[in-house]
Design a protein with these regions (language model features):
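Mature catalytic core of soluble alpha/beta enzymes
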Residues: 2-315
């Protein structure tokens, strides 16, 4: 495998600018938002537009964040407001559709379990009785949209929010007439232009497992190798299976989804990680959407035609 610097799950390795005939000077705007490091790379002349894109990220963070007590979602979960605004409601509806699609393996009502596991701080796994108690306060079927009701649950949009925001950013850049953009929202990558993108190995930090060529699309990777703790030789990670209330235990070590719709790619990367290689068939429900799975055994499984379509090369 080829050694690389950094540990992002997806790495835009090289930009190809055919329209201009040569590569222009580039600028990258970096910020901490959406509970992660984000970067937006554009031609240098478009730097101010990239800075405005960061402001757009922060606007949506005030809608969808679970860690900001003033966000619209936090106030909805806390009962301070009873009905979400149009964009929050739309994203909740999208999340519910994926919950139904996976028969509840993917579930946007896992806030109590997310809080219980608290991967950033926890050193030992919770007791089974604690997990059972948290599960009693979950269940996507309890949420209704008309009239709106959480049904005693709390919403966590962590598996769809960054994808939704990436779609909004693409719309913004298109409206501004800006091309040749890489938006990296912590592993959710929106590409406007043609790029070679690297997929990080889930087994060795800083190494590429594969590279692929992408054009005007989105790529999202989910894996268990960045946010986790270990206890008694067992790794406990942040991707939870709603059916068990515990860390997902499929055959997947890493999942990458490519789709023109970033919110679909975001949700599917999590859903397929939970379901494992059997979940690859979910991509057939969505136009021009493909996925690859690096299994725990080091095998590479993809949707049909993935390697040819994206000029995939295993390192």
């Amino acid at each position: 495998m080829k050694k690389i610097q950094g540990c992002a799950a997806l790495i835009a390795a090289a930009a190809l600018f055919f329209a201009a005939g040569c590569e222009k000077k580039r600028e990258t705007v970096r910020a901490f938002a959406l509970d992660t490091e984000i970067s937006i790379t554009t031609d240098a002349a478009d730097k101010k537009i990239a800075e405005e894109a960061v402001a757009i990220c922060r606007k949506y963070e005030k809608m969808f964040s679970r860690t900001d007590s003033e966000s619209e979602l936090c106030r909805l979960n806390g009962g301070e407001i009873k009905t979400p605004g149009s964009e929050l409601k739309s994203l909740i509806e999208t999340g519910l559709s994926f919950s139904r699609l996976t028969d509840g393996a993917f579930d946007i009502t896992l806030a109590p379990l997310t809080d219980l596991w608290n991967i950033k701080e926890r050193k030992i796994p919770p007791e089974s009785s604690e997990i059972a108690a948290a599960l009693r306060n979950t269940g996507y079927e309890r949420v209704t949209l008309a009239p709106f009701s959480l049904g005693g649950t709390e919403i966590d949009l962590g598996a769809v929010a960054k994808g939704y925001i990436a779609d909004r950013l693409r719309k913004y850049f298109n409206e501004q007439g800006v091309n040749n953009v890489i938006c990296d929202l912590g592993g959710n990558v929106m590409l406007s232009g043609e790029y070679t993108v690297g997929i990080q190995s889930p087994f060795s930090e800083g190494e590429l497992f594969a590279v692929m060529r992408l054009r005007y699309t989105n790529a999202v990777t989910s894996g268990a190798y960045q946010r986790y703790f270990e206890y008694n030789g067992v790794r406990y990670h942040h991707i939870l299976d709603a059916r068990t209330g515990s860390c997902a235990e499929s055959d997947a070590a890493s999942v990458t989804v490519v789709s023109p719709c970033a919110v679909n790619a975001d949700a599917l990367s999590t859903a397929i990680f939970i379901l494992g290689t059997n979940g690859l068939e979910l991509c057939s429900r969505f136009p021009d959407t493909d996925a690859s799975v690096i299994t725990k055994d080091g095998e590479y499984r993809t949707t049909e035609g993935f390697a040819e379509k994206y000029k995939l090369k295993i390192k």
